Regions:
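Conserved functional hotspot residues or short segments at active or partner-binding sites
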Residues: 86-196, 202-203
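Acidic, polar loop-rich interaction surfaces within structured domains
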Residues: 1-108
């Protein structure tokens, strides 16, 4: 199907290790085909929502009659969807489900369609108490939105994005260190090199 499969650009030894060693099973071994995930929010708890990072398929998301073709999933792969929501009430019980995840897929070489449902509990946590993985994912989402000059970022700055990434990144992880470098390069490209304080020359 259109869009299935994987590709990679190997420009250094670290990228080759990532693709050919760390992610080998994800790249070469598919465990499911035509995978689609739908998320249904509980209208009693969620007043408005916005899916972040799906701008190229915005029409398909807003049109309930449209069909989004699923894709294949490799062994050990994972995916993360980030939503911005406005709640319908100030506080909700932790026992209430805020949404329902509906997963549709087919096993490889099997035409039968399988369905799985997963309730999403209301387990809100302040940002400073989130796991570092989620903080880093937030920084990456903000980074992409900043590149597109998104109106939803408000007063977010490159420095704020960098600070979140620096506090949550694993410094022994090459890819996460490379991400920190990308933020600095993007900041310089968008805003120009930062001026360093120096001594002023005395006028004669």
């Amino acid at each position: 199907k259109k869009g299935n499969g994987n590709y990679a650009y190997l420009d250094d030894i670290m990228e080759a290790e990532k693709v050919l060693v760390q992610e080998l099973t994800q790249t070469f071994y598919a465990v499911a085909d035509d995978v689609v995930m739908n998320l249904e929010f509980n209208p009693l708890l969620v007043k408005q929502y916005r899916l972040i990072g799906f701008d190229n398929r915005r029409d398909a998301v807003t049109d309930p009659s449209s069909y989004i073709e699923g894709g294949e999933i490799g062994s050990g792969s994972s995916t993360l969807a980030i939503f911005e929501i406005i709640t319908s009430m100030p506080q909700a019980s932790d026992s209430q489900n805020i949404a329902l995840i509906k997963l549709r897929y087919s096993l490889c070489n099997n035409p039968n369609v399988e369905y799985l449902n997963f309730p999403v509990i209301n387990n809100f946590e302040p940002f400073n108490r989130l796991h570092n993985e989620l903080k880093l994912a937030t920084s990456i989402a903000m980074f992409g939105m900043q590149l597109r000059n998104s109106k939803y970022l408000g007063t977010t700055t490159w420095q704020m994005i960098y600070d979140i990434a620096l506090q949550s990144a694993n410094t022994s992880n090459f890819l996460q260190n490379e991400y920190l470098s990308l933020i600095s390069k993007a900041d310089e490209l968008y805003n120009g090199p930062k001026k360093r304080p120096g001594k002023r020359k005395k006028k004669n």
